Amino acid sequence: MSPQESSVQPSQFLLLVGIPVASALLLAQCLRWHCCQWLPGTCRKPDDPEEPVSPSTPLPEYELPRQCPAPTLPEVAAFYQELHMPTQGQTVTRQMMHKLLVFSAREVDHRGGCLILQDTGISLLIPPGAVTVGRQERVSLVLVWDLTDAPSLSHRQGLVSPVVACGPHGASFLKPCTLTFKHCAQQPSQACAYSSNTSLLDAKDWKPLGQPGTHISRDECRILLSHFSLYTCVLEAPLGQTARKWLQLAMFCSPLVPGQTHLQLRVYFLNNTPCALQWAITNEQPHGGRMRGPCQLFDFTGARADQCLKLKYISEGWENVDDSSSQLVPHLHIWHGKCPFRSFCFRRKAANGNEECSALTNEIIVTMHTFQDGLETKYVEILRFQASEEETWAVPPPVSQPPLCNRLPPELFEQLQMLLEPNSVTGNDWRRLASHLGLCGMKIRFLSCQRSPAAAILELFEEQNGSLQELHYLMTSMERLDCASAIQNYLNRSPRGSPDRLHGGTWENHGLELDEKL
């Protein structure tokens, strides 16, 4: 072999080996960058800007992935059988197939009927004639507390109502049924009803409902159903506008007992709907937590600002155990209706045998401020919490069941609201009805600041358990013959042409069970 040949061999070797190796490394790097675009969070390009990191607050349990085994056919059959079993007018809360459900079921015939979920603001009315004469149908009304069943929303969309299922899925009737539930949107015109034409255990396919048959009032969504499925309400403002919804802030803690060294306070950020508060109460029951004081309203904006909870004052004798005096709730956790909460843990300071210091720790007073990040100078809510050892927490106070109150038929309610709303020069409007119901001038002035004073006073009449005959008499004595005529026309349309009678706290209309608001 010549010297020239022997000198070329190393360079040839480098070309043969180096080029494939370099190509493989370059290909691997390209694949890595490509995967970053499709799998956000797994890796990051070196030149990408760092994303802001929020304070280290543990994610709530609802954010953790759940691996649930696929249900078998017998399990699915047993699930729906239990869900549609008549509950004898009771509202049942139960964990079924990894879902926390609140439901009621009954049988209805040609006379119709009504299903109500207690303390949630949810009802389903099956009108007379919706079922063929001689047949009986089992129907169910379900509040779904499984947050994974809610629609997948963008940052511009907010969840403002519960997810409600009417069953059996796909059931249809001769006449439309009326589903009613509460929402917390500040502008009803920005809220839209959604439906998922799927069963409760299937993957959901949420789509907006059209306007016909859907009516969204100031705090209520009413849908005329041609068939049964899943329903909810979503808030989305037009471009250039800001969407807002009402929150209720609820504080919970366990009893403060002698010798207890620590106390945890939890603040829930909930949609301002009855069922959201019931969820928090149910969530606290296993831990012995009870609500402290009334809920406070909060004007929450969809401007993508996180919610801050800042500790401002702790009474003497107690100290904050947490590393920080402020907590942060991600905006979308609230905007998408995930019912998040944040907590502070407090510890008694050592008394050192000082009776005066020990007496100070028998009571704890806490003040907190909550606001959206960056908006502290514009809007802050102040939360005050107080607990003491002297309170009787050992035995829960007896729960007095409020008396049943009649609810005016929706179409009549709206007609009377429209007639009574305009202010009359003589005061012969909703204000006169308020006076007849015993309200003083100060309360009437307060009602005048409401979005619909007429609706508020009609709801008060419902809570006083008044009958249609009593309302007809009041309108006649007020010389509001237009309202009296509207009531009389409704009574004349009732079966057999006879007026409704009040019986046992419900409207008895010859077999038609109208809605009862608890």
Swiss-Prot record:
GO CC terms: cytoplasm; membrane
Domain Death span(s) in chain numbering: 415-494
Transmembrane segment boundaries: 11-31
Tagged with keyword Transmembrane helix: yes
Annotated spans, Interaction with RELA and NFKB1: 186-400
Keywords: Cytoplasm, Membrane, Transmembrane, Transmembrane helix
Active site feature: H227, S229
Pfam family, one: Death
Listed InterPro entries: DEATH-like_dom_sf, Death_dom, UNC5, UPA, ZU5_dom
Domain ZU5: 102-237
The UniProt record lists the keyword Zinc: no
Topology class, membrane: Single-pass type III membrane protein
Ranges per topology, Cytoplasmic: 32-518
GO molecular function term, any single one: peptidase activity
Task performed by this protein: Inhibits NF-kappa-B-dependent transcription by impairing NF-kappa-B binding to its targets.
Assembly: Interacts with p65/RELA and NFKB1.
Name of the protein this chain belongs to: UNC5C-like protein
Organism annotation: Mus musculus (Mouse)
